[in-house]
Amino acid sequence: QGVNAKIVRLAIEQEAKSKNQTMEQATKRARRLADEVAADYSSAAINFLERLLTLFVWERVFKGIDVRGLDGIRELAQSHEIIYLPSHRSHADYLLLSYILYHRGMVPPHIAAGINLNMPVVGGLLRRCGAFFMRRKFTGDPLYTAIFRSYVDALVARGYAIEFFPEGGRSRTGRLLAPK
């Protein structure tokens, strides 16, 4: 759907009118925003990160990973959309969930990531591993809000699992944060 989704087309029209722009200018901005948000999922990137994490992180940090309840999730995923809402105490949170799912033959989720993580090299790798980026604030930009909403709606409609962190950001102390 992208910029052709009804909600986005309406927001483009509103943007063009409110900012005295042509439809072409507003549509161009909508495409830039869609590119800013969207993941660019790549099996090769997932395989690369899996090998890297196995060799240099998981086998050195953990003695093992105790996974419980995955069969129930696998069963639910056959007929329901899955949204994971883990706590976010460290960077390991999103990496570990995707790693476990991948190793158990399930597709890792698309992960909502703060726009601050969209930096050179790291941002591209995260995007290819399923991260989609979101700004901390949506206020004052109806076009961005429409693009983001349309993107998440499309992921859900296509049956992709999504991972959001209710706290909004990673804890700096290791303690759970209040949801935002």
Where are these regions (language model features)?
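Membrane-interfacial terminal anchoring regions of lipid-handling membrane enzymes
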Residues: 1-163, 168-180
